[in-house]
Amino acid sequence: MKKVTLAAALLISAGAASQNFHLSQYDASVQYLNPALTGIYFKEKTDYRINANFRQQWKALASKPYTTFSAAYDMKYDDKFGVGGFLINNRSGAGNLNTLTFLGSGSYRIADDQNGPHNLTVGIQMGLFYKSFDPNGFTYDNQYSASQDGFDVSIPSGETFGKTGIVRFEASMGVFYKYIEQSKDAMPFIGFSVYHLPKPNESFTDQKSRMPMHFIVHGGSDFKINDNLKLVPTVLYMNQARAYDLNMGLSGWYRIKDTDAEVMLGVNYRWKDALIVQVGYKQDQHIFRISYDINTSYLNAFSGGRGGLEFSLVLCGKKGEPLFKPVSRIN
């Protein structure tokens, strides 16, 4: 009975983790946002892109904080196709519930700016995820020791599990539209994507537990204020079963005079959850950003406002050329 109860608790925590993992800098991990963004909308001097995100949250509430790490590579195959792949790892709390996902991505431009300002792209992803947990990371009722006034993990739990890891097939799809007209001051964009298309069984027991499909709608616009300043309002809506996220934000990019460098400042609000502040720096199409979530939900009473710290790095390069420009020497 204890094993069944623990397994049920694991399934609940697994579902909660899959719904509560956020990337505040979601636009820095485009394949995680929408497979239709794979290998597209590069600048003229860019053929490929490397990006990575790291996030840690709930450090104030859990003995082991929730962590998310992602890494990705994508490139344009020609003027119509983009290909890439990404890996993301989520690890949550006690029991080290871990989900490692690897997906290959592909995109196709149905319409592009060679024929006009309207750009429409579709994309698909396929791959595998591995989900596991460590039963030694939990405590059990028979490990309670009155003499120690707490749990003694050196006492055998007496519990056995048929399996502590599963591998499942994963797939997703998306569509993305962007209006691109360099002579215009506003260039809007919107996308839609669906993840967990096969509704994989994520149960560690013989009882099936299907992962609900995850729906994402995202959009915004690039507004050119002048030659040095750009404002980008954005909105993100995600829904999975009965859980949803609404994220609204505004960021500003300012080009430093007489340089190719830009600095960025942004503020987002995740509905009934967190206020997100982020800063960034861009040089030669490489972007580094750091953000912090200030918790505003009911958990604020326990977290003291401390939410999640996140970093992202995006590197863009051209085939046959160094990824980083050599530093000029001062004579």
Sequence positions of predicted segments:
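Sec-dependent signal peptide hydrophobic core
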Residues: 5-9
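Subset of outer-membrane beta-barrel
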Residues: 19-331
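Positively charged n-region of N-terminal signal peptides that target proteins for export
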Residues: 1-4, 112
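Short, linear, compositionally biased motifs with a strong N-terminal bias
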Residues: 10-11, 204
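N-terminal signal peptide c-region/cleavage motif recognized by signal peptidases
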Residues: 13-15
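Absolute protein N-terminus
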Residues: 1, 18-19
